[in-house]
């Protein structure tokens, strides 16, 4: 169904080959997973298969690529999309309307499908993904995970026999990942061909027929299904990759030491309320105390209000009622950005420079010893070799590391990280863990909005569960048992 023979690709605006000498065959009905460190060429391979390289992302391609027996270079994009549908890493990049319902039916309308058939598909896909509560919502109101679901649903509306997915689980809560697993199993049982680019492998371990590892633009290892069940997490971690078993204990996963006990509060939230629409509250009386040294994992289902709470903490949103105190004194929204930093879920919103280096220099021109600090953080996050590249040419994982690096230079008393590891391999995740630990220290605090179980165990010393607009659990991370229970039963 998908055949690549000695395929190489180089973008026009970069000197190095993005992928080189890729030979790969995916048979009809197979589910093949491609993984590898951030920036290894996975997304470029994805773009070559769906025709966006070189038609949209300009560059030079060599070798041959066929899709369903047809030479890809001779096909129009519209012909390719009739065979293969794509779920992109950033779901917002494939939205064409402003509301959920319109966006779901748009692909079918664009292909001239009859109204009755569109309605039948809409009913089937909505039921499959449990989207009924979202149908009348605006896309701008959705959480990152909800947007991810809509992107997946719009692709399923096309009912193509080949489905390509780039990091489909990156913004999803645990139950939504379980649902995605069931959907992929259904598609596979019906003979769909699935090619999935992914860092988080645990939900695919039982489904995939082959796991392919890329490194520096090339395929370096391939694991057959029978072999995967015999491999522990440590072997993958040694390669800088995520493990296959989410809740398996391993030698590299450590519970972060608890912060030293102190009665001095850094930030206090009392009875915080907020809603985007009249008579619909997202936050319903939030009470939270944040202490120096806290590295808080803010967890909860998609759409529960985690990002909204994060934006209130840093002043991007103003609470509709309630009190926020800093060091026991009133802390109005208009001045919070001076003390609180924010790393957004969509990192493209925070990239402004013409190069990686310029992006870190921006706003830090007066920073003492700025050159040494910039080079140090570039080295810590393995970005030194990329410092002259334009930020838009980076992979999603590299972009995430860049905005985390910028937050390190700002050195705010409180930093909110919104899904900082969604595009990161295991090695990069550990580097980010170390940097957040350095940012927090003993005097600052960090709040990390995340669904990443491995990351929480490696980084956080406290977890807060947001549920039904209120904080329902708040506990120190002394071990993984309580966190594992919450992931399995309440996320």
UniProtKB/Swiss-Prot annotation:
Keyword Membrane: yes
Subcellular location, principal: membrane
Matching InterPro entries: AAA+_ATPase, ABC_transporter-like_ATP-bd, ABC_transporter-like_CS, ABC_transpr_CbiO/EcfA_su, ECF_ABC_transporter_ATP-bd, P-loop_NTPase
EC number(s) given by UniProt: 7.-.-.-
Protein residues bound to ATP 1: 36-43
Localization: Cell inner membrane
Record-level Gene Ontology MF annotations: ATP binding; ATP hydrolysis activity; ATPase-coupled transmembrane transporter activity
Chain residues that bind ATP 2: 300-307
One GO CC term on file: ATP-binding cassette (ABC) transporter complex
Keywords recorded for this protein, A-Z: ATP-binding, Cell inner membrane, Cell membrane, Membrane, Nucleotide-binding, Repeat, Translocase, Transport
A Pfam family matched in the record: ABC_tran
Gene3D superfamilies the UniProt entry points to: P-loop containing nucleotide triphosphate hydrolases (3.40.50.300)
Sequence ranges assigned to domain ABC transporter in this UniProt record: 2-241, 267-491
Membrane topology: Peripheral membrane protein
Biological function: Probably part of an ABC transporter complex. Responsible for energy coupling to the transport system.
Family, similarity comment: Belongs to the ABC transporter superfamily.
PANTHER family: ABC TRANSPORTER ATP-BINDING COMPONENT, HEAVY METAL TRANSPORTER
Record protein name field: Putative ABC transporter ATP-binding protein TDE_0906
Protein source organism: Treponema denticola (strain ATCC 35405 / DSM 14222 / CIP 103919 / JCM 8153 / KCTC 15104)
């Amino acid at each position: 169904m998908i055949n690549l023979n000695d395929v190489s690709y180089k973008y026009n605006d970069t000197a190095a080959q993005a992928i080189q000498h890729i030979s790969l065959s995916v048979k009809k009905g197979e589910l093949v997973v491609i993984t590898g460190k951030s920036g290894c060429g996975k997304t470029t391979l994805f773009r070559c298969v769906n025709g966006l390289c070189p038609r949209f992302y300009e560059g030079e391609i060599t070798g041959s690529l066929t899709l369903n027996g047809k030479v890809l270079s001779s096909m129009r994009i519209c012909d390719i999309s009739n065979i293969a549908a794509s779920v992109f890493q950033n779901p917002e990049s494939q939205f064409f309307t402003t509301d959920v319902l319109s966006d779901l039916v748009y692909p079918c309308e664009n292909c001239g499908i009859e109204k009755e058939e569109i309605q039948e598909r809409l009913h089937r896909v909505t039921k499959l993904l449990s989207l009924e509560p979202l149908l009348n919502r605006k896309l701008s109101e959705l959480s990152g995970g909800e947007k991810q679901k809509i992107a997946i649903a719009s692709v399923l509306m096309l009912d193509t026999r080949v489905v390509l997915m780039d990091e489909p689980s990156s913004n999803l809560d645990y139950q939504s990942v379980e649902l995605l697993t069931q959907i992929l199993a259904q598609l596979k049982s019906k003979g769909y061909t699935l090619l999935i680019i992914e860092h988080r492998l645990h939900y695919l371990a039982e489904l995939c027929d082959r796991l392919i590892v890329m490194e520096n633009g090339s395929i370096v290892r391939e694991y057959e299904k029978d072999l995967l069940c015999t491999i522990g997490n440590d072997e993958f971690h040694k390669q800088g990759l995520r493990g296959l078993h989410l809740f398996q204990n391993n030698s590299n996963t450590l519970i972060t030491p608890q912060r030293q006990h102190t009665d001095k509060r850094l930030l206090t939230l009392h009875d915080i309320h907020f809603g985007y629409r009249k008579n619909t509250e997202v936050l319903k009386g939030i009470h939270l105390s944040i202490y120096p040294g806290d590295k808080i994992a803010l967890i909860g289902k998609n759409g529960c209000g985690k990002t909204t709470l994060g934006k209130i903490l840093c002043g991007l949103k103003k609470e509709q009622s309630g009190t926020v105190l800093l060091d026991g004194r009133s802390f109005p929204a208009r001045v919070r950005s001076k003390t609180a930093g924010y790393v957004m879920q969509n990192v493209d919103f925070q990239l402004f420079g013409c190069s990686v280096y310029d992006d870190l220099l921006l706003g830090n021109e007066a920073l003492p010893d700025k050159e040494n600090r910039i080079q140090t953080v570039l080295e810590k996050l393995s970005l030194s070799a990329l410092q002259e590249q334009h930020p838009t040419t980076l992979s999603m994982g590299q972009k995430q590391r860049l905005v985390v690096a910028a937050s390190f230079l700002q050195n705010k008393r409180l930093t909110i990280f919104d899904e900082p590891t969604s595009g990161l391999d295991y090695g990069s995740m550990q580097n980010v863990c170390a940097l957040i630990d350095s940012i927090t220290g003993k005097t600052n605090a960090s709040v990390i909005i995340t669904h990443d179980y491995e990351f929480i165990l490696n980084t956080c010393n406290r977890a807060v569960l947001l549920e039904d607009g209120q904080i329902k659990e708040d506990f120190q991370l002394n071990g993984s048992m309580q966190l594992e229970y919450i992931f399995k039963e309440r996320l």
